[in-house]
């Protein structure tokens, strides 16, 4: 491994993750024009951000860097595929891994996997409906659209906030940090859908200032303990979201992991799999009609 990579990984273990993220969050919320305009302009240049799809195309018109980062798109920028029964991609990004949940483990990178139960906060009963099911890990790069949408119409059953570290998420840390996604802070949202259980897990990372959902707003840590909120009929008024509807967003972005139960859906064998994807594209079809692809290598 190159020395610069070793140095970067060492810094990941030594850095005060949450302090760095809080400081970045404050800077990203700053509304002083001389500060926020400089941050936005540098970001657009560095990452070659395409503003032509944004509802507000002028990057300096946003009130803060976070407003720019979580910008809305024009109504026709992400048309939803209309294949009956299809599960859609929830976000713009790149599929880093996709496949089956094998013996309660989810593939991370060569030589690394993490536990399904750990990912969902350590509750075996919560994880059981997804055992033997399917997963897709979608990485959102800095230049991507950072709102997360529903792959299927669903009724929210539970939201789980799991505190943790905030390692950077990139190919190097995926190859090198054991159980990366089950160690980083995350918010797991569990839904009931026409194809059975579905979970969307929004994973934080270094400098990810916050994670929001459309029903709870900003999800904040709670005494560094796992916090579960029930939303089913027995607990409070049910929340139903349509297919393609926004369900959450990242302020400075990271990763979304999608989980489905067993024998309901199969991923499409498309050129886009394990590569760039856009929100609204079909990722999976009912098991009887889709074609599976080889296991992750």
UniProtKB/Swiss-Prot annotation:
A Pfam family matched in the record: PS_Dcarbxylase
Membrane-crossing residue ranges in chain numbering: none
Post-translational modification (record): Is synthesized initially as an inactive proenzyme. Formation of the active enzyme involves a self-maturation process in which the active site pyruvoyl group is generated from an internal serine residue via an autocatalytic post-translational modification. Two non-identical subunits are generated from the proenzyme in this reaction, and the pyruvate is formed at the N-terminus of the alpha chain, which is derived from the carboxyl end of the proenzyme.
Site positions per UniProt: Cleavage (non-hydrolytic): 253-254
Oligomeric and partner information: Heterodimer of a large membrane-associated beta subunit and a small pyruvoyl-containing alpha subunit.
Function: Catalyzes the formation of phosphatidylethanolamine (PtdEtn) from phosphatidylserine (PtdSer).
The protein's name in its UniProt record: Phosphatidylserine decarboxylase proenzyme
């Amino acid at each position: 491994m190159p020395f610069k990579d070793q140095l970067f990984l060492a810094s990941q273990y030594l850095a005060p993750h949450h302090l760095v993220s809080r400081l970045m969050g404050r800077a990203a919320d700053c509304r002083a024009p001389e500060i926020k305009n400089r941050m936005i302009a540098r970001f657009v240049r560095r990452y070659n951000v395409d503003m032509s799809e944004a509802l507000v195309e002028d990057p300096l018109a946003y009130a803060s860097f976070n407003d720019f980062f979580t910008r809305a798109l024009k109504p026709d920028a992400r048309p939803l595929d209309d294949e009956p029964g299809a599960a859609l991609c929830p976000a713009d990004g790149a599929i880093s891994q996709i496949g089956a949940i094998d013996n309660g483990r989810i593939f991370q990178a060569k030589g690394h996997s993490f536990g399904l139960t750990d990912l969902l906060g350590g509750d075996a009963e919560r994880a059981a409906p997804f055992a033997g099911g399917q997963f897709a890990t979608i990485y959102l790069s800095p230049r991507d659209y950072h709102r997360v949408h529903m792959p299927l119409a669903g009724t929210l059953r539970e939201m789980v906030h799991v505190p943790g570290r905030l390692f950077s998420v990139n190919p190097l840390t995926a190859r090198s940090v054991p159980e990366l996604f089950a160690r980083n802070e995350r918010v797991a949202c569990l839904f009931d859908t026409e194809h059975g259980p579905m979970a969307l897990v929004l994973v934080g990372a270094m400098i990810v200032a916050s994670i929001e959902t459309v029903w709870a707003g900003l999800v904040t840590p709670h005494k560094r303990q796992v916090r579960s909120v029930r939303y089913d009929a027995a607990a409070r008024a049910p929340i139903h979201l349509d297919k393609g509807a926004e369900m959450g967003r990242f302020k400075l972005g990271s990763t979304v992991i999608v989980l489905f139960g067993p024998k309901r859906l199969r991923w499409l064998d498309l050129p886009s799999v394990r590569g760039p994807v856009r929100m609204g594209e079909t990722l999976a079809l009912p098991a009887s009609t889709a074609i599976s692809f080889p296991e992750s290598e």
